[in-house]
Each structure stands twice: as C-alpha cells, then as structure tokens.
Amino acid sequence: MRVLLSTCGSRGDVEPLVALAVRLRARGAEVRMCAPPDCADRLAEVGVPHLPLGRSARPAAAGEAKPLTAEDMLRFTTETIAMQFDRIPAAAEGCDAVVTTGLLAAALGVRSVAEKLGIPYFYAFHCPSYVPSPYYAPPPPLGEPPAPEGTDIRALWERNNQSAFRRYGAPLKSQRAAIGLPPVEDIFEHGYTDHPWMAADQVLAPLQPTDLDAVQTGAWILPDERPLSPEMEAFLDAGTPPVYLGFGSLRAPADAAKVAIEAIRAHGRRVILSRGWADLVLPDDRDDCFATGEVNQQVLFRRVAAVIHHGGAGTTHVATRAGAPQILVPQIADQPYYAGRVAELGIGVAHDGPTPTFESLSAALTTALAPETRVRAEAVAGTVLTDGAAAAADLLFAAVGEEKPAVPA
C-alpha cells in the first residue's frame, strides 16, 4: 500500500503524521509526505520522502506579532488551496490513500484532488472543538472579532460555517471547476469527511458526540529515544528541577520569555528556555538559565518542575504523559481547549488570556508548583494511552484493504 500524508501547518501538525508514517512503514506500506519546507530535516531523520507544501512558518513565528486581518486570511487561504491543487496531483500519483491533518485550509484542496483521482481520503484532527458539535464551541475564526459573550454554541458554529464559505468558497469553487468538479455544499464536511479520526487521548480530550461520525484513535506520538545533550544533563544535575519555558513553532507574546523568567526566578526556580521558531533569547547570562534548541521533550519533561507552553495538542500530550504540571498560555486554534482541559483535570493552570504578566505567571506558578498538582499530574500521566498511531494504521489498512501490495519497510 502506498500512502500520501499531507499537512501545511506547524510542527504540531507534522509530528503526528511522522508517528503515523513510522507505524505504516512498519506494516509494509510505502509512505511519502507533503509538508512545509521547515520539516525537511525532521522527515529525513525518519526516512520519509518529503515533498514541500505550504509556506515556511519560521519567519512568521520569529516576526513581530501583528493581528491577522480578514484580508490576510483570504490571501493565505487562496494561496494555500491553489498550492494544493498544483502539487498534490503529482505527489498522490500511484497512491492508494491520502491522509491529511491540520486546519480546514490544509484539507480542502487535498480532498478535492483525491476525489478527482479516485483515491480514498482520510482526515484526522487533534482537538474536539475542530468539528461541529453541540458540546464544543469552535475556535474563533482567525482575523475576525470574537462573538459576543454567551453566544449559543450552535450559533457559533453557524458563524464559523459562514466564515469558512467567505474564505474558502470562491477559491475552492474556482479550482474545482478547473479540473471538472462541481462546487461543494458543506465546506467542513468536504475537508473533514463524514467519518474523521480524532488523534487525541481519551482522557485529555474526551470526544463527545459530534455532527460527524468521528472515531477517536488516541494521540499519534512517536516514541523519542534521543538522549539529552551533555550540557543539558550537566545543567539538570547541577540543581533542583527547573521550569521549562517554550512556545514551540508559534510566535511568542511580546517579552514573554523575559516576564516568565522573572516570575520563575521569583519562585526560586531555575529555567530551561526553548528558543523555538520564535528564536527566544535569555535576558542575561546568569547560570540559573539554560537555552536550548531542538530537544527530546519526552525525556526532558520527566525531569522538570513544571512546563510553561502555548497549549498545542502535541506539547500538551507529551507534558501530560510525562506527569509534569503545566501552565498553558493559549494563543489560537486548539490551545484554549487544551488549556481548559489541563485546568479541569487539576494537572496545571490555564492562563487567562494570551499575554502573560509577572503577576499572572507568579500566581500560576504557585498553583503549578504545589505538591498536590504534581501528585495529580503523575496520576493522570498513567492513564494516557500511547498507541494512537498504531490504531490509525489499523483503521487505514482496514478501510483501504490488506490486499494492496506491500513494500519493504
């Protein structure tokens, strides 16, 4: 069986597909992946052929934070959809299945090309609030003002549906017409299918009934056995467990690193700062802080006092599995949902708003560093399942058929 995996999102969208790719290859499938150019080195590490798709996310992450306008989003989605129609046909040639993850814009063109080529298409999402449901409010549309507080959940989803048609309807209709396909009636169902997979843990992100027939596989996490660097090992051994601070592949709030380090120091704790794609820097050269680039979070998070992060699905799952108390400073998309879940489970704190202050982080650290939070985090860690990618591979083989010719893993 030959499988094309595709996303045009951040590192958090790519890593689950890496885990799925490894599981599929272990079962004899041939896998290739369309992903942003930033991910070339990561895919080379696991031996998955990489076909660049989408823009590099690094310049945006490192740039000054600017609110996205509706015009920005329309331009981005038009370019993204056009790029999918341009590049996916060649990438999907000879494939027996296509699997996509990410936001809606990452899926629409891919689904249409798969439809044209007659290739089975599957979509996976990482957060319950991504699919229409009476139980979850959707993430607010990027570039648009928030809805009035107290708006009914169904009204919020209708608002999102209208926003999706404004953004995606015209460019999708135009591209589909160019290859002889009719317009789509339901933007969400077209991208997500009527039977999507949710790649998230059942405890951390329990799936309530949705308008689509979704199935929860568990999180797609690839076990990471890379050792920590000798320099980081020496730092960890030189004192009490530090607090980890990082915002992954996203833009960080202004002065977030400086403010957070001041708050962490005020609690008498040391700091490990992940530079991330925003290229965060230490405020000084004191020996109580250690800055790092790419690191094995699965190993590191088991050795820290707490984890301060943006609340993306991947980082939240890794920190939860490690039993580390968390402080989530959510910015966009799935992050507010995961911040709320961490607080509900008693394994950390959901920061109120996207911009931390010394006072807000100091209060959050008081809770996160409390012994009872650590006890609760360690208890929940033991309930997180680790075989979601294997379950998804089983679903794919069952849906497409075991009779497809296998290739060496």
UniProtKB/Swiss-Prot annotation:
Swiss-Prot/TrEMBL GO biological process terms: carbohydrate metabolic process; lipid glycosylation; vancomycin biosynthetic process
Any one Gene Ontology molecular-function term assigned to this protein's record: UDP-glycosyltransferase activity
Keyword Glycosyltransferase in annotation: yes
Entry-linked CDD domains: GT1_Gtf-like
Keyword Transmembrane helix: no
UniProt entry keywords in alphabetical sequence: Antibiotic biosynthesis, Glycosyltransferase, Transferase
Enzyme class: transferase
InterPro entries: EryCIII-like_C, Glycosyltransferase_28, GlycoTrans_28_N, UDP_glucos_trans
Pfam families found in the cross-reference section: EryCIII-like_C, Glyco_transf_28
Secretion signal, residue range per the UniProt entry: none
Domain of life from the UniProt record: Bacteria
Functional pathway: Antibiotic biosynthesis; vancomycin biosynthesis
EC numbers for this chain: 2.4.1.-
Listed Gene3D superfamilies: Glycogen Phosphorylase B (3.40.50.2000)
Family: Belongs to the glycosyltransferase 28 family.
Summary of the function given for this chain in its UniProt record: D-glucosyltransferase that acts on the aglycone core, transferring D-glucose to the phenolic hydroxyl of OH-Phegly(4) to form a devancoaminyl-vancomycin (DVV) intermediate in the biosynthesis of glycopeptide antibiotic vancomycin. Also able to glycosylate A47934, an antibiotic with a teicoplanin-like heptapeptide, but lacking sugar residues.
Note: In A.orientalis different glycosyltransferases are involved in biosynthesis of the vancomycin group of antibiotics. GtfA (AC P96558), GtfB (AC P96559) and GtfC (AC P96560) are involved in biosynthesis of antibiotic chloroeremomycin, while GtfD (AC Q9AFC7) and GtfE are involved in biosynthesis of vancomycin.
Protein name: Glycosyltransferase GtfE
